[in-house]
Amino acid sequence: MERPSLRALLLGAAGLLLLLLPLSSSSSSDTCGPCEPASCPPLPPLGCLLGETRDACGCCPMCARGEGEPCGGGGAGRGYCAPGMECVKSRKRRKGKAGAAAGGPGVSGVCVCKSRYPVCGSDGTTYPSGCQLRAASQRAESRGEKAITQVSKGTCEQGPSIVTPPKDIWNVTGAQVYLSCEVIGIPTPVLIWNKVKRGHYGVQRTELLPGDRDNLAIQTRGGPEKHEVTGWVLVSPLSKEDAGEYECHASNSQGQASASAKITVVDALHEIPVKKGEGAEL
């Protein structure tokens, strides 16, 4: 019996392929069927906040999904992400059974912003991502307000503000005392301490600390949070000359802020009044 030639085998394989192609294309078209806009589910009365997309068959309009909302999947509930986002399958599903492999029919994920870094909006607000900025802008426009645009990447710059001001202190000569102050701002502020001398007509002058004082030290460190700075004034031993008003002053390119507290020096503990100012310390 003669073996079939290579040419005959190739011709037979090509013929079989031609027979199978119409079957696959007809099954795909049968899934969608003719487009009938009248049978499409209605959109929300106020429209789609993130815009519209089309269903899997390209027929019915549907609302685009936002960040963190489900996407993918199969059937009528299939969702598509808004522009600037991508549908990401969970690791559990990717490691699951073969029938639930990533990209397979029926597999769903969540919409994730492609740009995953903070941005500064024209309203002075820092948004975790460009997608959240666009969503906020669309909400503003739906209320008849001005659109929000991206000013820059990263967090918005802001002037310093006092997180924890220094507190008034009462103590005896020879003691060790300290004042502390915590500030925040973007860029991170520069913190300095001044001793303020006031007269009858307001501030007379300020003395930048530590100056030439042997019993006074200044310490500053970043934190505890990002863009925060904490500073201390340590006085040891305390003398009568150290009494007065001390100012915590913070500044950056966006502005400045300050807060002050007083150190009161007495000769004996019994001289300290029972009721001191709110926030005062020994």
Swiss-Prot record:
Pfam families on file: I-set, IGFBP, Kazal_2
Subunit structure: May interact with VPS24/CHMP3; the relevance of such interaction however remains unclear. Interacts with CD93; this interaction plays a role in endothelial cells angiogenesis.
Annotated disease: Retinal arterial macroaneurysm with supravalvular pulmonic stenosis: An autosomal recessive condition characterized by the bilateral appearance of 'beading' along the major retinal arterial trunks, with the subsequent formation of macroaneurysms. Affected individuals also have supravalvular pulmonic stenosis, often requiring surgical correction.
Broad class of the protein's primary localization: secreted
CDD domains: KAZAL_FS
Post-translational modification: N-glycosylated.
Coiled-coil features, chain-numbered ranges: none
Gene: IGFBP7
Disulfide pairings: 32-57, 35-59, 40-60, 48-63, 71-87, 81-111, 120-156, 181-248
UniProt keywords, alphabetically: Cell adhesion, Disulfide bond, Glycoprotein, Growth factor binding, Immunoglobulin domain, Phosphoprotein, Secreted, Signal
Gene3D superfamilies in the cross-refs: 3.30.60.30, 4.10.40.20, Immunoglobulins
Consequence of changing residue 78 to G: In RNA edited version
One GO biological process term: response to retinoic acid
Record function comment: Binds IGF1 and IGF2 with a relatively low affinity. Stimulates prostacyclin (PGI2) production. Stimulates cell adhesion. Acts as a ligand for CD93 to play a role in angiogenesis.
Stretches assigned to the Ig-like C2-type domain: 160-264
Top-level lineage group: Eukaryota
Domain Kazal-like: 105-158
Gene Ontology MF annotations: insulin-like growth factor binding; receptor ligand activity
Annotated positions of the Phosphoserine modification: 239
Record localization: Secreted
Protein known as: Insulin-like growth factor-binding protein 7
Statement: the UniProt record of this protein carries the keyword Transmembrane: no
